[in-house]
Amino acid sequence: MKVSSQESNWQKTLPKPFLGFQKNRRLEEVECIIPDLAGMSRGRSMPIYKFTPDTTFSLPISLFYQTISGEYVDMDITNQWMEKDIVLRPDMETAAAVPWADDATLQVINDLELSDGNPLNIAPRNILKNVIDLYKKENLKPVIAPEIEFYLTQPNTDPNEEILPPIGRNGRKGVRQQAYSMVAVDEMGSVIDTIYEYAEAQGLKIDTVIQEGGAGQIEIN
């Protein structure tokens, strides 16, 4: 399949981390994503020939009525089940690689609008933009320090079985009370290396990786 000059031009303007990861592979797919109220990634994927930076498409507003467990909220919401459409508009400044995908894939976070072009006021990104605007009115600039904390575990496909700490390079399970241990971090070296690789591909800068107090408990800043 030939790629049109218009498609080729916008692809050449993608962020440097993406182009560096992409190298000479032909882009196959685009993931258009949004965060829901629980922080879950939702959206649609499409073949590259269906996407341009001006592409818009719709999703039902009811996706914002789902809880973290997939159930729907029990609230008195006017016309809750009319399945009114909301419009997704790509923010190309968020374009990033999807290094865990089998095919060459682009990921783009979208802004959410109503059909009349006004921002959807319950969309997390729009709420955050409103908060930032309040800071600007006071001549202030908010600065954040993101921190991700999680547990590494052994693979577990049976919910009836106990979740166990991962096996390290030395063949032993991780143990507790090893806060800030460099040895404990090194034991998880293959996973940490993959995290660094994926972060670089997405243009994310990692400052530090720390072993916390729990077995397999990792913190990334």
Question: What feature does the model see in each segment?
Answer:
Residues 1-208:
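ATP/Mg2+-dependent ligation/transfer catalytic cores
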Residues 148, 212-220:
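Short, conserved phosphate-binding/catalytic loop or strand-edge motifs used
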Residues 176-177, 219-221:
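Short beta-strands and strand-loop turn motifs
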